[in-house]
Amino acid sequence: MGADNELSEFEKQRLANIAERDALLKKLSLDAQSSGLFPPKSARSSPGGQTKPKKKPPPKKVKKEDEHPVPRRMSSRLRGLAADSEVAKRKADEQYEAAQQAERAKRVRKSDAFSFSEMLVSGQKLSGDSLIGVDVVTKGVAMPYQRTFGDEDIKKTTDKELKALREEMSGLRLWEAWEPNRIKLTPERIYTMTFHPSEAKPLIFAGDKMGNLGVLDASQEKPTSAVKQEDDEEDAEDDDPDPVLTTLKPHTRTISSLHIHPSKPTHLYSASYDSSIRELDLEKTTSVEKYAPESTSDDIPISGIDMAPDDPNTLYWTTLDGAFGRYDTRASRRSAVATWQLSEKKIGGFSLFPTHPHFFATASLDRTMRLWDIRKLSHDDPVPVGEHVSRLSVSHAAFNSAGQIATSSYDDTLKIYDFGSKGIAAWEPGYTLSDAEMKPDTIVRHNCQTGRWVTILRPQWQANPQSSIQRFCIGNMNRFVDVYSSSGDQLAQLGGDGITAVPAVAVFHCSTNWIAGGTASGKICLWM
């Protein structure tokens, strides 16, 4: 009995401790709820007299009526195709081939004659009546807007004739009607440009990467609106219109070269990577193919085109395969086309000697500038009059009327070769020059590291300068256009506000001091 009584007392004490503990926990829970630490829990009875939290039901998902099932990838097994199925392979090959054929079709040249409406991309209709009428640059580093030639250089000039020309060329100013960033002449990167020979007004043509041809009449004046109403924001754009431009598409691939013969000012010749040379009649606004390989499947991209000043019927060209061609447009195609393989690598540029067009110069990826005489040119083993090898590839070789050649090269130099002083006009067929005689007379340091997105820099002479000093222009990676004399003296560095890209494609008007520069965005700068 004593043991039972002790056990009973112990049991009573244990139960009392449990009750005290529960009371304390309940009090702490109430205090926590009153202070907002956590919300009260709904309790339910349990067999032990303790409470358990009630489990919350999962939220109901509301189905959206307009929700479409997401497409899932399906394996070949689910589609009923065996592993490495010939059917799957054939289907993939067919899809790939169809995509390739569609891409090739876009790039195949079109041999048809085009009317204006068939070529027009944007702009107004062309009217025939309106159409006639030495710097040192750190190698490979472009420093936008940093000049390397300016007024101080002009002041230090001691030669009176040179100083006068420097002042004249440096006095050219940007066309004021529109800023350059608003004159978008072509949809894509400009590769080549030329002026119409007319001195009545500046008429500019530009060819781009995708075969588009842009035309700008820079004699147009910016229209002035009538009295403008205050707070009239809707008509703001109408009061400040862009210049009137015309964009045509005569080619399917890059237009690499443009040429207007002085005796045929109404005809523009264009050469392209689509292997064709076309003639655009500016009066009739029609385009016809003048030369192309016999088969449209022949891919022979043309890199340059030129014509002799005294012969408006013969076309000369070079290709990216290293060939040189000649074609008299008056004769039948097969009998009149003559080609020579002059290089194993790309010929990037060439030009004829204007006064003696049987001489011509080529610039090649094989690092050479070569001088040729077409009177003594073998088809089997063509031998040049002479050649000069540069450290890196030569981009272009431009002849002037004085017998001088200007080249640009990836070794960051402009080289000037004076063959006029060596008597080129009197050379007989078969005349050759030694390596020493082929060395350049002048070398000018010039940054030619254009990279992937800027068109290659090429020098271009003024065909008929108004003074005895020959001059050429070339783009500057610091967003200028540089002008040099044939002796390598810098005449000007043209820039201005609103030039937001490198005017890499720079061209002179043949006789007037007008210079245009084209950028990778299809916009142009014009100095007059």
UniProtKB/Swiss-Prot annotation:
Gene3D superfamilies: YVTN repeat-like/Quinoprotein amine dehydrogenase. Residues 230-242 have a biased composition (Acidic residues). GO terms for molecular function: DNA binding. One of its GO terms (cellular component) is chromatin. Keywords: DNA damage, DNA-binding, Repeat, WD repeat. Belongs to the WD repeat DDB2/WDR76 family. This is DNA damage-binding protein cmr1. It comes from Aspergillus fumigatus (strain CBS 144.89 / FGSC A1163 / CEA10). The lineage of its organism: Eukaryota, Fungi, Dikarya, Ascomycota, Pezizomycotina.
